[in-house]
Amino acid sequence: MEKKQKVVVVGAGPVGSLAALYAANRGDDVEIYELRSDLRDPTTTPLNFTKSINLALSERGINAMRHAGQPKLIEHVMGATIPMHGRMIHGKRANGDLFEESQNYDVYGRSILAVDRGRLNERLLDILEAMPNVTFFFNHKLTGADFRKNKAWFEVRDKTGAAQGQQSREIEVKFDLMIGTDGAHSAVRYHMMKYTRMDYEQVYIDTMWCEFQIQPKTVVPDAPLDSKFSISPNHLHIWPGKEFMFIAIPSDDGSFTCTLFAPATLYEHLESDRTGSLVPPFFDKYFPGVTTLIPPTELIDSFHRNPHLPLISIKCKPHHYGSSVVILGDAAHAMVPFYGQGMNAGLEDVRILFDILDKHARMDELSACADRAVSREHALAEYTAVRVPDAHAINDLALQNYVEMRASVLSPVYRLRKFLEEALSKYVPSLGWQTKYARVSFGNERYSEVVAKSEHQGKMLVRGIGILSCRVGRALHNE
């Protein structure tokens, strides 16, 4: 009988939890190590986040969960989401009237889903806890690793995050495979760098973010479900400001999780008055209508109480070392949140990794190869070769989409291209034409292929418009 593999997962967020689930379903012994306390404990606040974070869940993330071998997982997750059919652009006309303009994501009516990150994480952890081959180790900090000898060391901490006792207690853990899903400031990646010549690029963009909340409306019993929402629950709401923007994502309790994205200099300006008196006038000027949804006193309180956090973009290569370690999610490719693909890309990492591991395992069975380490090494090398260009592509797309969300959504050129591409997709489907957004959010083709196809479509559109303009000009000249 084949000996079980021991898989150590570092980081118990959604990506790490899904990776643990994939490994456990394949019969491996799985240990999950997490720096924080149990993430299901309401007193545990995720690192770098406030209490409530709503995220966009799209086809890639759904598909990864669909293949996790737990049918009730997808049923539970989908039941707690809100479909967002498109963007709702907010602004003020020249005459002072407020307006809302809906821009659907997709000509076929497909939606992305607003999901509560914490609840998704809780469901994954609950499933894992019921599995006999899964063990949790919360309050454990990775302090060292030897990826040649397949050993790691963890410092045991108390619930406050402090080391236990005057002399911290450290444990040694052996493993066959370590999966690093411990976020942008990954300890696994840090220790992996000691063993492989890793290309690494880290960029902090000149944008900070702060969270706000639109509270649910008070409604009478038996009122329609939508009546608890102050604005449409089926849209991602955007107040574009060219150099900054404000967004709102719905929650199923009727509230909206809102975020102000703005340059650090603007935050410094708003912080300069400790009374907060600069905040409401700023919102009134650039985000019309928000102060009717969030009272000025709440805006000021949230601005001062909630952290002002930077946005980081990380690229690295390779994503593995030998047969012993691989990094997924933000540990491998932290990205800015403007394409709604951070979590989706991380969940997709898991599916692709295990697809490749399974493929190599089947190949070894056919060739009667008994060395799983050799098989794993080949699989991890293929994973890096496949995933790095796609990770870099979605990183770049996320940065580009910030410009689109805060400025281009109001551009006639942007709207014209979107209209033409959607018309071609709907009325001439044989061309295989789709918008870049549809390819990213509603399909599973590689990100790098999406970029290549979008660039090709852009060139074809420019060429087509140029030819049409020449013919129209020639016809007018002949008249």
From Swiss-Prot:
<dbReference type="GO" id="GO:0070189">
    <property type="term" value="P:kynurenine metabolic process"/>
</dbReference>
<keyword id="KW-0472">Membrane</keyword>
<keyword id="KW-0274">FAD</keyword>
<keyword id="KW-0521">NADP</keyword>
<dbReference type="InterPro" id="IPR027545">
    <property type="entry name" value="Kynurenine_monooxygenase"/>
</dbReference>
<comment type="similarity">
    <text>Belongs to the aromatic-ring hydroxylase family. KMO subfamily.</text>
</comment>
<keyword id="KW-0496">Mitochondrion</keyword>
<dbReference type="InterPro" id="IPR002938">
    <property type="entry name" value="FAD-bd"/>
</dbReference>
<comment type="pathway">
    <text>Cofactor biosynthesis; NAD(+) biosynthesis; quinolinate from L-kynurenine: step 1/3.</text>
</comment>
<dbReference type="GO" id="GO:0043420">
    <property type="term" value="P:anthranilate metabolic process"/>
</dbReference>
<keyword id="KW-1000">Mitochondrion outer membrane</keyword>
<comment type="function">
    <text>Catalyzes the hydroxylation of L-kynurenine (L-Kyn) to form 3-hydroxy-L-kynurenine (L-3OHKyn). Required for synthesis of quinolinic acid.</text>
</comment>
<dbReference type="GO" id="GO:0006569">
    <property type="term" value="P:L-tryptophan catabolic process"/>
</dbReference>
<keyword id="KW-0285">Flavoprotein</keyword>
<dbReference type="GO" id="GO:0019805">
    <property type="term" value="P:quinolinate biosynthetic process"/>
</dbReference>
<dbReference type="GO" id="GO:0004502">
    <property type="term" value="F:kynurenine 3-monooxygenase activity"/>
</dbReference>
<keyword id="KW-0503">Monooxygenase</keyword>
<keyword id="KW-0662">Pyridine nucleotide biosynthesis</keyword>
<protein>
    <recommendedName>
        <fullName>Kynurenine 3-monooxygenase</fullName>
        <ecNumber>1.14.13.9</ecNumber>
    </recommendedName>
</protein>
<keyword id="KW-0560">Oxidoreductase</keyword>
<dbReference type="InterPro" id="IPR036188">
    <property type="entry name" value="FAD/NAD-bd_sf"/>
</dbReference>
<dbReference type="Pfam" id="PF01494">
    <property type="entry name" value="FAD_binding_3"/>
</dbReference>
<dbReference type="GO" id="GO:0034354">
    <property type="term" value="P:'de novo' NAD biosynthetic process from L-tryptophan"/>
</dbReference>
<dbReference type="GO" id="GO:0071949">
    <property type="term" value="F:FAD binding"/>
</dbReference>
<dbReference type="GO" id="GO:0005741">
    <property type="term" value="C:mitochondrial outer membrane"/>
</dbReference>
